[in-house]
């Protein structure tokens, strides 16, 4: 019987996460005119409930070991929760104001920032080629952001970009937590609860009543978010970022397809050039890292 390698499992899970997060964006946009903080709260609430049910089941089967937080993990749980919240809020704000594909590609700057934060947190080396790829990918993102003196016009794309920064830090934190053997469901519960708490002040002062349809759309978004979170946590548990991060870009394909089918969205020329630059740099970095590792193993 053929044994599936951890890298193959990581690739499978990262593509699953890309699909779920692209579909989540569709449901968030279909929910209509609701403040992005309120949307984020419901997204996290559903993910929290699903993760909590799984944790209670683990607790019943494995006892207190299922909920124990390893020594040294608390700092990185907070870091993952804060960074993930920045990622969610930035992404949700962007989804409401720009093309799904634009929001997705700027959010997919995350793998480049994962490399940077893995260097800072895990002391994984950044070699010259990946560093050049990061710089050129950043220049590609500028074509999508389209800097101007009109802050209102730029804000959604900047929010999407900062969402990518936050997601990159969150992924690096997940990798560190995997080394510390922290339960993946605990990571999701901690993040979801933290992000929900950040939303509470807004909900107390400015809650918008929702229709049954809007509630249903946000519940679907939350279910997709939970699927995405479980998948990305599993992916970085099974394999390091430098082996699987390239496959995260499959979300661009899903988002472009969903944006066209559901909202008749077509990216402009500058954005398309930006997509090509960022994805090309991701492919170059992946091939370089893969060849470097194979050369090391064959020595």
Q: PLM features: residue spans?
A:
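C-terminal transmembrane-helix exit sites in multi-pass transporters
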Residues: 110-135, 253-272
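Loop-to-transmembrane-helix transition segments
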Residues: 9-17, 61-90, 155-163, 203, ...
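Hydrophobic/small/kink-forming positions within alpha-helical transmembrane segments
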Residues: 18-22, 52, 81-89, 111-116, ...
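Transmembrane alpha-helices of multi-pass small-molecule transport proteins
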Residues: 35-86, 166-170, 189-205
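Helix-helix packing/entry segments at the starts of transmembrane helices
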Residues: 103-109, 177, 181-193, 229-260
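Hydrophobic/aromatic residues within transmembrane alpha-helices
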Residues: 31, 39, 94-95, 100, ...
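Hydrophobic transmembrane alpha-helices of multi-pass small-molecule transport proteins
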Residues: 129-146, 270-289
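Transmembrane alpha-helical segments that form core, pore/gating elements
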Residues: 26-29, 34-36, 51, 149-210, ...
